[in-house]
Amino acid sequence: MKASKIREMTTQELHNELKKLKRELFNLRFQLATNQLENPMRIREVKRTIARIKTIMRERELEQERANKNVK
């Protein structure tokens, strides 16, 4: 998933997507361990998407903190 598409999502949607991707990553790792995984590149894609989501969530936290500092 592209970062621009992730940025369009709300915070709640990001949390839901993060949960879904973590569940998928768990299942992919399980499939890898049992030699049932068809596309090993999917693990890499999911891990990178999780990292993108976490990065954008952190950016939003920092923006909120900066906004709160400027108000005081």
UniProtKB/Swiss-Prot annotation:
Molecular functions per Gene Ontology: structural constituent of ribosome
Keyword Ribosomal protein: yes
CDD domains cross-referenced by the UniProt entry: Ribosomal_L29_HIP (cd00427)
Superkingdom field: Bacteria
Record-level GO BP terms: translation
Keywords, ordered alphabetically: Ribonucleoprotein, Ribosomal protein
Any one GO cellular component localisation term in the record: cytosolic large ribosomal subunit
Pfam families: Ribosomal_L29
Family affiliation: Belongs to the universal ribosomal protein uL29 family.
PANTHER family hit by this protein: 60S RIBOSOMAL PROTEIN L35/50S RIBOSOMAL PROTEIN L29, LARGE RIBOSOMAL SUBUNIT PROTEIN UL29C
Protein name as annotated: Large ribosomal subunit protein uL29
Origin species: Caldicellulosiruptor bescii (strain ATCC BAA-1888 / DSM 6725 / KCTC 15123 / Z-1320) (Anaerocellum thermophilum)
Gene name of this polypeptide: rpmC
